[in-house]
Amino acid sequence: MTGDVILQISNLTKSFGPVKALKGVDFELRRGEIHAIAGENGAGKSTLMNIIDGILQPDSGEIRLDGTPVEIPSPAAAQKMGIGFVHQEIALCPDVSVAENIFMAATNSSRSFLMDYKGIEAKAREVFAQLSSIDPSVLVRDLSISNQQLVEIAKALTLDCRVLILDEPTAALTEAEAQVLFKIMRRLADQGISLIYISHRMVEIFDNCDRVSVFRDGRYVTTQDVAKITPADVVRAMVGREIGDLYPEKQRPEACSTTEVLRVENLCEAERFHDVSFSLHKGEILGFAGLIGAGRSEIAKGVCALEGQVTGRLWLNGEPLALRDYQDSIDAGIVYLSEDRKGDGVFLDMSIASNVSALKVEQVASALGLIQPGREIEQADRLGRKLNLKCGTLQDPVSSLSGGNQQKVALAKMLSVNPRLIFLDEPTRGVDVGAKAEIYRILRDLAEEGAGIVVISSELPELIGLCDRVLVIHEGCLSGEVSGPDMTEENIMHLASGTQQGTGAASVAAQ
């Protein structure tokens, strides 16, 4: 990382009607550094990045690029200035090749009617030689999400990008894919490219970034070298207060109930998982840990009758249970909250109230089957208050909400059927630390009210901080259980990687 400043922002303001999104923000980016941006949802991060990329125009303030004042009227202008933006949502044309996607980016930035396709293809191959072994002739839809993200980065680099903005780039990546991305980021920084890295994940910020700037309520708070501060310092700056109680208090061992909410025996499904047996007790939050692809989500879906040919036996509150499909599961009070919030968890273009009632619309319908808006609003209002949902009106589309509040709507939809058992897959993915603390409190409250809670997460600190027990899954089988003082990242990773079979305190519970 060099000391010279490539991008400098001074006293930037931006309002949307009466709402002040940016309030005199300052920011500087050095050449060849990886600079993290941290802040809760609504802190102003996205607004600032959209201004840097020319998507939005500031109301006042100054932007300097290489010391020269500039205006960035559009994303095309940003590209010509060497600014690239890889959004969290992939923006590629799936039915054309990698090379054609890059050609389109080049066309948008070119003033010429004639494109140097051979030159662009040569440049693309040169860039991919650095990034990965992606074949430019392959259709984008045939690539994994991680490789599609690399194509987005390649688009920027083929346009001689000097500043690269990455917005939550690991949200859909496996751990191995994320590590590849981090190596590429460092390689680009070593070549003099400056990266702005937006993430809610403190581990990623502290492992891969040089500096971090914190924003809160539309204001710039501080910039620090990551080597000189701690994650707790960043969180404190983000929220303006201590979050010592990020995780609510767990059950005391002597208070643990022996009453089983759920019992699973010998659950199997083809090649996905085998002979899975476990139990969940009243008032308990149970965690599922394991590497990506180990079968965690598939087991949860198997219990909820969302998978195909599943065999095995289930008991709910001591009664045998046979489920033919997910509707049977819902009717029995067992629900599954998908890790893909925007794909399966909520309907972004529908109202908050309609989302909440979507799982069982007959609850808000008349005898003739017509939805009663009054009932729908009443249900959404009751559950919204329970979950501390922050919104304008319940008729607003879910797309208008922050990630944390979208997740609360998805959870309210689950609660609308009065579930006895809730499986939550990556429940805090893409939400800020303040929203995480609220979701953790909600889950603990639900457990104390008698619901069975199973949390699937790739974040080990989350599982350790929230759950009373953690089951570890390796290649479709339960490899062990950890609880109490044995619930450590080291023990979980040993079991998840298959280097240790559970024994004693770190073993599969006797069934």
UniProtKB/Swiss-Prot annotation:
Record-listed E.C. numbers: 7.5.2.7
MF annotations from Gene Ontology: ABC-type D-ribose transporter activity; ATP binding; ATP hydrolysis activity
GO (cellular component) term, any one: plasma membrane
Entry-linked CDD domains: ABC_Carb_Monos_I (cd03216), ABC_Carb_Monos_II (cd03215)
Family the entry assigns: Belongs to the ABC transporter superfamily. Ribose importer (TC 3.A.1.2.1) family.
Keyword terms of this UniProt record: ATP-binding, Cell inner membrane, Cell membrane, Membrane, Nucleotide-binding, Repeat, Sugar transport, Translocase, Transport
Occurrences of domain ABC transporter (ranges): 7-242, 256-500
Protein name: Ribose import ATP-binding protein RbsA
Bilayer topology annotation: Peripheral membrane protein
Binding site for ATP: 39-46
Pfam family, one: ABC_tran
Gene (name only): rbsA
Job of this protein: Part of the ABC transporter complex RbsABC involved in ribose import. Responsible for energy coupling to the transport system.
Annotated source species: Ruegeria sp. (strain TM1040) (Silicibacter sp.)
Compartments, record wording: Cell inner membrane
Subunit structure: The complex is composed of an ATP-binding protein (RbsA), two transmembrane proteins (RbsC) and a solute-binding protein (RbsB).
